[in-house]
Amino acid sequence: MDFFEINLTAVVQLLNFLFLLWILNKLLYKPFLGMMEKRKEKIEGEIVEAEKLRKQAEEIKKNAEEELKNARIRAEQIIASANSESEKIVEEAKQKAQKEAEKILQNAYLEIEKQKQEALAQVQTIATELAINLAMKVLKGTLDEKAKREYLAKVIKEYEK
């Protein structure tokens, strides 16, 4: 019968233990879960933002490629125009027509190259900035400084290709 008797010390210890669990739950566990949920929501928001930035970068790249294509078409039109003009001038004076056609073609090629270089530089600058912003938002607070730098270097190398 001693086995089934209630030991007052054991009951008090059990109540103290339950009270301690309740305190720990209120003071540590619930705030910790709340903090983790906020962090999860923040990361999910940053992932959504990163996806938006990636889509914007793709749109900018697409627009730059379209501008480059238009520049090539314009250059071809300039070249075609220069060729027809040079044919007319050749009829009047062969020497003068040949020099003028070469000058027009040279200017057209220089303009094409200039526009091409500007478009490529613009695309690379925008893509690099977006990649850095994207990486910084995604990596903010999740990696140590060395890991951030290595990841950023990797992203920049990929965009430079």
Curated annotation (Swiss-Prot):
F-type ATPases have 2 components, F(1) - the catalytic core - and F(0) - the membrane proton channel. F(1) has five subunits: alpha(3), beta(3), gamma(1), delta(1), epsilon(1). F(0) has three main subunits: a(1), b(2) and c(10-14). The alpha and beta chains form an alternating ring which encloses part of the gamma chain. F(1) is attached to F(0) by a central stalk formed by the gamma and epsilon chains, while a peripheral stalk is formed by the delta and b chains. F(1)F(0) ATP synthase produces ATP from ADP in the presence of a proton or sodium gradient. F-type ATPases consist of two structural domains, F(1) containing the extramembraneous catalytic core and F(0) containing the membrane proton channel, linked together by a central stalk and a peripheral stalk. During catalysis, ATP synthesis in the catalytic domain of F(1) is coupled via a rotary mechanism of the central stalk subunits to proton translocation. The keyword Cell inner membrane applies. Keywords: ATP synthesis, Cell inner membrane, Cell membrane, CF(0), Hydrogen ion transport, Ion transport, Membrane, Transmembrane, Transmembrane helix, Transport. The keyword Ubl conjugation does not apply. It comes from the Bacteria. GO terms for molecular function: proton-transporting ATP synthase activity, rotational mechanism; proton-transporting ATPase activity, rotational mechanism. One of its GO terms (cellular component) is plasma membrane. Pfam families: ATP-synt_B. It is a single-pass membrane protein. Belongs to the ATPase B chain family. Signal peptide: none annotated. It is found in: Cell inner membrane. Gene3D superfamilies: F1F0 ATP synthase subunit B, membrane domain (1.20.5.620). This is ATP synthase subunit b. The chain crosses the membrane at residues 10-29.
